[in-house]
A protein has these predicted regions:
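Switch/connector loops and helix/strand junctions flanking conserved nucleotide-binding motifs
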Residues: 47-48, 94-95, 170-175, 196-199
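A short, basic N-terminal segment
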Residues: 1-35, 53, 57-82
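Mid-core helix/loop region of P-loop NTP-binding domains shared across ATPases and GTPases
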Residues: 78, 89-154, 161, 193-204, ...
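Walker A (P-loop) phosphate-binding loop of P-loop NTPases
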Residues: 44
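Hydrophobic anchor at the beta1->P-loop junction of P-loop NTPases
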Residues: 39
Length: 248
């Protein structure tokens, strides 16, 4: 389990699941072939967390310039980072979404070029936006028609892999925009945790939170059965339930 600090989450350590493994393969394919991919799933199944863990994106990179020396901390961040993560704002015009994307792709490119010890500052500035291999847009359901056109234009211009994350049905909405839909190469449905997988990972989660699960104790087994039944594989519900357990 790897540390992934996200405000508001009780489960600070990321637990690799089968669904994350499938998401990783899907995202890597979008990078390798420079396609647009759609990731859809019910609320709370872990789409956003999977995207954050896959990219290892850190907002500290935003604002990085070509002049100042790259700090050791940011060099470690960019070495582990596989792309930019953008959460579509509730109010999004083409200008807003363009700014949100380019700020991050530029920061990624500048940081990567400096980490690779590129001596030519002009080259760093001019080529920075083209160095980002992947852009993931979370809450893509919020994007307006014009904002989607802007995203498509940036995708064509900079040739990064693109993943759009949203709710079930987002693919039907995109199908109404032929210019965007024709560029979609992959689709992935992010599903809930299976019951078997929940029973496998829960003891690990408990251990990480400083709790002990003993399968020989009836009360522990009964507690596990109750959690499985109540949460039904929804990661957000699992996180909330464990936050209540810790509080008590």
């Amino acid at each position: 389990m790897n540390e992934l600090h996200m405000p508001g989450r009780t489960l600070r350590s990321f637990v690799p699941t089968q669904e994350f493994g499938k998401f990783r393969e899907f995202a890597n394919s979008c990078v390798d072939f420079r396609y647009i991919g759609i990731c859809l799933g019910e609320p709370g199944v872990g789409k956003s967390l999977a995207a954050a863990h896959f990219t290892q994106w850190c907002e500290e990179l935003v604002g990085e310039n070509a002049i100042d020396e790259l700090s050791a901390k940011k060099e470690r961040i960019i070495r582990n980072c596989s792309g930019a993560l953008v959460t579509a704002p509730v109010t999004n015009t083409p200008k807003i979404i363009r700014t949100e994307i380019l700020r991050r792709t530029h920061a990624y490119g500048v940081a990567l070029a400096k980490a690779n010890r590129e001596p030519d500052v002009c080259k760093v500035v001019l080529e920075a936006k083209g160095l980002c291999p992947l852009v993931i847009i979370d809450e893509a359901d919020r994007l307006t028609i014009n904002a989607l056109e802007e995203v498509r234009s940036l995708y064509d211009q900079y040739q990064f892999g693109l993943v759009l994350i949203g709710m079930p049905g987002i693919e039907k909405r995109f199908a109404r925009y032929p210019q965007l839909y024709s560029r979609i190469g992959f689709s992935h449905e992010f599903k809930r945790l299976s019951e078997d997988e929940m029973r496998f990972i829960f003891p690990k989660i408990w251990s990480n939170l400083g709790l002990t699960y003993n399968p020989d104790y009836f009360s522990d087994v009964e507690a596990l059965n109750t959690i499985v039944r109540i949460t039904a594989g929804n990661f957000r519900l699992i996180d909330r339930l464990f936050s209540q357990i810790i509080r008590n």
